[in-house]
Amino acid sequence: MSKQPVSNVRAIQANINIPMGAFRPGAGQPPRKKECTPETEEAVLPTSDEEKKPIPGAKKLPGPAVNLSEIQNIKSELKYVPRAEQ
């Protein structure tokens, strides 16, 4: 019985394509971005009476109050424009 030299080359080559940290929890592909659809504009907006109601236990924060629906409306009007080739 002749003994052949032991080689770890195949084992190393097999593991070459595994990225660092691949076996750590949460190391999968990042979540895909959902495309913005105009259905969000059709959502029921709260009336002014509902917006004025204070939440019990809420603290008054410094700075101006920002209307979230206003920001969402402006954001929905924005459109991605690809850069023109020069």
Swiss-Prot record:
Which InterPro entries does the record cross-reference, listed alphabetically? Answer: Chisel
Which residue ranges are recorded for the region named Disordered?
20-64
Annotated coiled-coil positions are none
Q: Which domain of life is it from?
A: Eukaryota
Tissue expr? High level of expression found in the heart and skeletal muscle, a very low expression in the lung and spleen and no expression found in the liver, kidney, fat and brain.
Give the UniProt entry's GO cellular component terms. Answer: costamere; M band; muscle tendon junction
PANTHER family, sorted: SMALL MUSCULAR PROTEIN
Protein family (similarity comment): Belongs to the SMPX family.
- What's its job? Plays a role in the regulatory network through which muscle cells coordinate their structural and functional states during growth, adaptation, and repair.
This chain belongs to the protein called: Small muscular protein
Q: Which gene encodes it?
A: SMPX
